[in-house]
Amino acid sequence: MELCENITVNGWDFELVENDVDDVFYQCRGEVMYDDEHDEMPEPSLWRAAQKLVDILVKDGLRVYAGHSEKGWVEVTINMNNGL
């Protein structure tokens, strides 16, 4: 299966990043937000879009998971070792 270079979900543009054969993910950056314990968290609407992207990619037969890192980044990581 060939992956789309960019995917827009709920108005958020996720960019495909292919660093290595085992390091492939979609990423999108929102505002830096903080929870009640002052830990960084993704924007709620961006996180919902990431979860929807997970659902889309799973329906396409991929094994994926969503995560977030610092500075507002959200990633949807693709497990490329699943028969592709």
Listing of model-derived features with the role each one plays in the protein:
Residues M1-R29:
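An N-terminal amphipathic alpha-helical segment
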Residues G72-N82:
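C-terminal edge-of-domain segments
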Residues D20-W73:
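Acidic, low-complexity, intrinsically disordered interaction modules
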Residues E15-E18, S45, T77-N79:
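Short amphipathic beta-strand/extended segments with alternating polar/hydrophobic composition
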Residues F14, E31-M33, N81:
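Residue-level signature for short turns and capping positions that connect secondary-structure elements
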Residues M1-L3, M80-L84:
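Short intrinsically disordered terminal tails
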